[in-house]
Amino acid sequence: MELSQLEQRLEVLEGRVAFQEVTIEELNQTVVAHQRDISRLQEQLRLLSDKLREQNTSIIASQSEETPPPHY
């Protein structure tokens, strides 16, 4: 192979590597953003679950809080 052909091939490979580096960085930023979203959604789910659990326990009265039936 001639030197000019090798230089052309090298330039093509360098261009591909540069493109891949940009793509990898963009993908990394996307993954980081998704992880932030997942963490935020997990926290919201935890808060909603806690709130629902609190509401369920407050709806059901304990035996001592129940008024006796009318025939007592």
From Swiss-Prot:
Q: Which domain of life is it from?
A: Bacteria
Q: Which InterPro entries match?
A: SlyX
Q: Which residues cross the membrane?
A: none
Family membership: Belongs to the SlyX family.
Q: Which HAMAP family match?
A: SlyX (MF_00715)
Question: Which NCBIfam families does this one have?
Answer: PRK02793.1
Q: What's the protein name?
A: Protein SlyX
- Give the organism, scientific name: Sodalis glossinidius (strain morsitans)
Question: What is this protein's gene name?
Answer: slyX
